[in-house]
């Protein structure tokens, strides 16, 4: 009874305070003159969380938005909320429009539509609740009250009542609260009532918040409030907003070791990695020609990567942290990241390895408060020397790596029986992702260019080059090879191309040799010869992700990222037509920094012009201070792509 009274009082404090004078709040909130770049503003956004001993949370949300423009009116014309019915319950309790002329309209929430959410590749039965408000006008305000219970990530669905909404790590509570928005927020308040028996740790990142803790007989009340939250200006290629914008992390889990042991135990108890005679037979078949420990791990990883299609179908019980059984995935030959990871663990164990599941966050940083900041499941194998190695069958289909270097500098947590701390994947050296392009060509007196060039690549560069095969039907391969030539010069004629066998990707890095002819490539007149060497113009830019970076910024405010570290070396010898003197050779200053290195040059000896260029992209995630060297390297390569050589005749 005391707890219900306390909750009622807290609701009065958080929501009822605003209800006393909604009209005044709307009138004093400002308009489009005060916020010229915003379509709407949030006047208040309050969340009250009531945490039970089981970890189950009851969440009450009260929000008021004011429309400033027609775009803002369109955005608020429909109220929509997504949820996973296996782990969360959502109820839209109240929707009211406060019109600019003083009228109010209360909407019938029994008319809320509950329907399957649109989905692609992962079909886990997610749903959305929606209520159409209709046409609104600047000056109107929309007030909404939500109630929800449950948690964000699904595990094992319970049988009845609220059991299914209790978090996976029973008895524990966590939350990740964003205190940033793409529209102005005048006040955001987050309050959590938690049993006194639970120890809650929290940290506010990337900013400041007003906080307080109140102690009652059997509960503690934590409050966090931030006012005047303004949209932050996005930078092209920056890291995730959650890495740099204000956010609050809360968790009752003591540390990552506890989370690690729990993750290990929940999958072992479920029997996720038990093998079958059919799986054992397949493992023996895959490993019949394996040469050593690493070859065995590679063969099993690539089988799970290549042969298990990425497609998630809801199996009901078991979605989320619990990995489906190896038997199920082996039968279905499809699944999402956790299924591919679980299949690999099952096969590795069948082969005699010690292997476990792990979790990571693709796309953003995991901070040290042990809240569940995960969106991706991976595999860990213990080598014979005792070291742990991480594997990712989801990200390496037809890629020569076992752990994708597009995930370097990424946090992960291994689920081990002894527990583990949060870790980070190291930087992958650029030379592991080399891209070598070497050419020989000749410019005829009529301006026709004839020549050959060879591309060799490894790691993620190999995967990018090999994409002309991997992501297309075999009938289109020749056309795709030709398109890479035509991107440089639409007049190009592909005479011949040879390449390594794509299906042999595990054994041999990709290598391609083109023979081509390009009529009217160079401008050749009685007075001069003007051209840019073919290799310098950037053939196979599909493997040069750094060239797609927006380099218009003088400085960076936030960390930024590219696809992967890279070592690019481009060389070409061009046989020239007769000429008298060199009028102009492009020059780009060498640079060496924490972000990137660059060197490039031209040399002419008699009738042979030699072009050399080397670009080193040193990592995937960069700090603002790395921007200068990275930007210079990119701009220098672009300059060499566009600036011509000029010879006098």
Model-derived regions, located:
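A sensor for short, sequence-defined functional sites
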Residues: 20-649
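Sec-dependent N-terminal signal peptides
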Residues: 4-13, 344
